Amino acid sequence: MLFRSKEYALVGLDNGTAFIDISDPVNIVYLGKLPTHTSPSIWRDIKVYNNYAFIVSEAGGHGMQVFDLTRLRNVANPPQTFTEDAHYGQFGNAHNIVINEETGFAYAVGTSTFNGGAHFVNISNPLNPTAAGGYSGSGYTHDAQVIVYDGPDPDYQGQEIYFGSNENEVVIVNVTNKNNPQLIATINYGSVDYTHQSWLTEDRSFLLIGDELDENAFGFNTRTIVANVSDLDNPFYFFQYFGNIASIDHNGYVKGNRYYLANYSGGMRVIDISNIANQQMTEIGYFDTFPANDNVNFNGTWNVYPYFASGNIVISGEGGFTLVKSENFGLEDQSIQAFSMSPNPARDFVVLRSAQSPIYSVVAHNLLGQEVLNVNHFDQQERSEEH
């Protein structure tokens, strides 16, 4: 019996969104592209909720495209040109989109609505997204993270909290009540030039902040600012980490005790943050997508995605798409696993569970090697999926 899981990379292009099957990492398949809704733009952002991709762009009039990712499972003759399944047009251009998968809300930021602050969209029905208000009180947000709070501050347990990177500061906003979002606090730091993006540690005690333009403005090596946010009402600057090279930081994400940083000409840097509470961060690896230099310029890596169950990491940027894996993992195929059942033939029910990778198909053979079962469709409520 075999069971297989699928992983897809969704990569923003200047003229659309590319879909790549990376389930077999040494034999990837370009499945096709969803063209931009309007005109080309080098800025395009994609997030996923319940098997749907939500896509925004800085292109004028673009709005938010919705694409059903289950269509990728049976692409007969790749690459194909796809069409969107739904569209939301209550804003035009947007720099970014943030989704809280726990609540079913999307937050478009950097639009022409709500002073560039968060534009709330209810996506609980992905094919019929609806406007749900917004937050304009702190001006333009470039990027954000939104969570159902489960950190150390008892005052905000279970509430929906927004951490917005707002060019010259980070804002913390309670967005639980979409009709009345409330500013909780702001985070400031020295030598600010452009507060670009930030991400929480998994224990929610610290926020890692990237300033996109400080390396050029002040001559720093790559700098990451760390704020203590264990008390949301009273966050404070904690310390700053400087990398080994001069290149510009762009987006960074935490997985476990590692911080994966898109570092433009420096490629992707991997930083150990296991001792962050003692103001220590240590680079432990990197993959350089722009080997020509590590200068302060906008060449190289724009983004990284380290959250696949397989351990594969997607890097995207001016050089295109790159798929890498930690040297701690081998290249052997982990997506297909075979096992036997006793007795064979089996009777009654067989229950299959996967602790990490979702199960997409099951193939069963009898003792003669004949295929007796081939199932590739499962009730959505009986399994979870990750793209």
Language-model regions, residue ranges each:
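C-terminal outer-membrane/trafficking sorting elements
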Residues: 334-386
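Single conserved hydrophobic/aromatic residue that forms the stacking wall/gate
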Residues: 2, 386-387
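Feature marking well-ordered beta-strand scaffolds used for ligand recognition
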Residues: 1-329
